[in-house]
Design a protein with these regions (language model features):
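Conserved polymerase palm-domain catalytic core
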Residues: 54-69, 73, 108-117, 121-271
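Extended C-terminal regions of large enzymes
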Residues: 351, 356, 360-427
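Core structural elements
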Residues: 64-68, 73, 175, 315-332
Length: 427
């Protein structure tokens, strides 16, 4: 494919219109100039021709990204770089033209940030490899990958495919556009900031070199962005692969392997893309399930959504719970979790009973509502005036009967087990 005149494809009306719609659809925060995504259309109507001419003549200068620090579950910090909405628009237009070119080069076992690919496909591929006798895992952790990408190495790799100097120029400009941290400018000497529309593609272009090396060595692997695992048949092979691939990553790609987090392990000790793995002796196969840390995060969020002090209606809590439940099940539906869903359903009902009990407020109102729900008068008044804590009362048999599973379902609450069974079919 001729890649010597890509800038005109990038600046075509059709491509720019698609980029505009995508940026507006994605919404997103303001960059350093404070412009909102809702203002992009008016801005382009006034300045679009000037921007296009600047891109053609290599005079366009991207603005620095705005640094945003996001806490990680392990206590660390993930640095995001928020470009201006104009730069997001230009990056999106570039990515739309470059992506089909690189899709022809990317490895079939690369699943992150690619069209029509997802984390679930990566998990299913990994399971196939594990169940084919490759049950020793090389789990390689790249230390601050997006913050440490070597610009020269990346541009050299891009230059092997892209021959349009205008495109090469603007991509490099985005890499070195700088970072604003609390109104202080900082040069971006290395890295491709997470948050830009080009960053996922650039990450895959860099790490495709790793994919090619692993393919050349005949290794079984799956990669989702910078999260890569390799599956081999023995512990000795796994340790050898860990040494050799780590050396390649650091010496050839200029990246850093976090040897503290990288490890050789069996599937049972692996956490990958939120999934854990276990061996099912009934079918003599490894299977996936939500990892214990993913379950803990679910429970934490579920408690937040059913917090008794959250000053919203119970119907609103149920609505938000349902959204969260559906999203979580849709992500983990390829895993085995019927028993887990039953347990979590019980936890959710228990939390909602506490919310409803608090919502009734006074003992008199509680007794009145219990009687409406067919609790005998003597039991209703005994429970309403007993003074027990919410947590204990939520386990009370009469309250469980009054605020039953059937009644909570009639309020619109989604059953995790039912939704999981419906989404995963016969699993």
């Amino acid at each position: 494919m001729d890649t010597s005149s890509l800038m005109e494809q990038i600046l075509s009306s059709d491509n720019l219109n698609i980029a505009y719609l995508q940026v507006v659809r994605n919404k997103g925060a303001e960059g350093v100039d404070g412009m909102k995504y809702t203002e992009l259309g008016e801005h382009l109507a006034k300045n679009g021709k000037i921007i296009k001419e600047q891109l053609r003549t290599r005079k366009y200068k991207p603005q620095p990204v705005r640094r945003v620090e996001i806490p990680k579950p392990d206590g660390g910090i993930r640095n995001l770089g928020v470009p201006t909405v104009t730069d997001r628009f230009i990056q999106q237009a570039i990515a739309q033209v470059l992506t089909p070119i690189y899709e022809e080069q990317f490895h079939d076992h690369s699943y992150g940030f690619r069209p029509n690919r997802c984390a679930q496909q990566a998990i299913l591929t990994a399971l196939d490899m594990m169940n084919d006798g490759n049950d020793w895992i090389v789990d390689i952790d790249l230390e601050k990958f997006f913050d440490t990408v070597n610009h020269d190495k990346l541009m050299t790799i891009i230059g092997r495919t892209i021959k349009d100097g205008d495109v090469i120029s603007i991509v490099r400009k985005y890499l070195v556009s700088g970072i604003m941290i609390d109104d202080e400018y900082e040069d971006s000497i290395v890295g491709t900031p997470q948050g830009g529309n080009l960053s996922p593609l650039l990450a895959n272009i860099m790490l495709n070199e790793l994919d090619k090396e692993m393919e050349k060595r005949g290794l079984n692997f799956v990669r989702y962005a910078d999260d890569c695992i390799i599956m081999v048949g023995s512990e000795m092979s796994a340790n050898r692969v860990m040494r050799n691939i780590s050396r390649f990553i650091e010496e050839k790609l200029g990246l850093k392997v976090n040897m503290t987090k990288s490890k050789v392990d069996r599937p049972r000790g692996l956490k990958y893309l939120g999934f854990g793995f276990y061996f099912d002796p009934r079918v003599h196969q490894f299977k996936a399930k939500p990892h214990a840390k993913s379950v803990a995060k679910f429970k934490k969020r579920m408690k937040e959504l059913t917090c008794r002090s959250w000053g919203v209606s119970n119907s609103y809590k149920v609505e938000k719970l349902n959204q969260f439940i559906r999203g979580w099940i849709n992500y983990f539906k390829i895993g085995s979790m019927k028993t887990l869903c039953r347990e979590l359903d019980g936890n959710i009902r228990y939390r909602l009973r506490m919310c409803i009990w608090k919502h009734w407020k006074t003992p008199q109102n509680r007794a009145k509502n219990l009687m409406k729900l067919d609790v005998p008068r003597w039991a209703a008044f005994k429970i309403a005036y007993c003074g027990d804590r919410y947590a204990r009362l939520a386990h009370n048999g009469w309250i469980q009967k009054a605020i039953s599973t059937k009644r909570l379902t009639s309020f619109g609450l989604v059953s995790m087990l039912d939704y999981y069974t419906e989404r995963c079919g016969t699993c």
